[in-house]
Amino acid sequence: MANILITGASSGVGAELARRLATRGDSLFLSGRSEDKLKNLGLNASIFAGDLTSPGAAEKLVASAISELGSLDVVIHCAGIGLIKPAADTTDAEFTHVMNVNTRAAFLLARESCKVMAAAKKGLFITIPGILGKAPMRNASAYVASKYALTGMIKCFAQEYQRSGLRFCLFHLGGIDTPFWDQIQMAVQRDKMIPVATAADLILQAIDAPPHLVLSEVVMQPESHQLV
């Protein structure tokens, strides 16, 4: 059993992972913006409702997780937002917001949690830049920028914590059939997307890998978009 912190745990991949990990007996600390949604998961887990972009939120989240769990073995960062919009129509405020949520919040969480895990000389940090963390897409420049930055940032963390016992895993997954798409003004074929259960299966493989091995970067795409 492991002590695991999951952000973005109230829906989508984060919620699916929380349910799977709780079933097998791992100790969980779940974070999301909606306390009600976290409680409605009905899991035996500690919860933290808040906005990771708020001052001091990441520090408080990690400290609370340590207080409840005693230690951290795995951090799974699933929180994020989307923005599909032509560059010419993207406002300064929209660009700043998507970078704050998708990149800055991830940096703050990684900074605080990696300090703790490095002190214990073990730990796994998983995040999901998605396929747009390594491939461009029209009408998504701000979103792609936030995900490319996330990819590069975590690779820097991996270098800085080399030989410290920490492992880092990036999941470059294509479109996953989650509520994320409910808020996106874009025609998509939900039935062609990666099922949430399949994405969770893949991430569980990274968690269960032997401690001397790491799935550094994992790419999974729908067949129609392979080799992007």
Task: For every predicted segment, state its role.
Residues R24-L38:
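Conserved glycine-rich Rossmann-like NAD(P)H-binding loop of the short-chain dehydrogenase/reductase
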Residues G130:
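Residue(s) in the substrate-gating loop at a strand-loop-helix junction
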Residues P86-A87, E94-T96:
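Substrate-binding pocket helix/loop in short-chain dehydrogenase/reductase
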Residues G50-L61, D92:
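The beta1-alpha1 cofactor-binding region of Rossmann-like NAD(H)/NADP(H)-dependent oxidoreductases
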Residues A110, S146:
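Active-site helix of classical SDR
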Residues R163-L166, L170-F171, V188-V228:
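C-terminal helical subdomain
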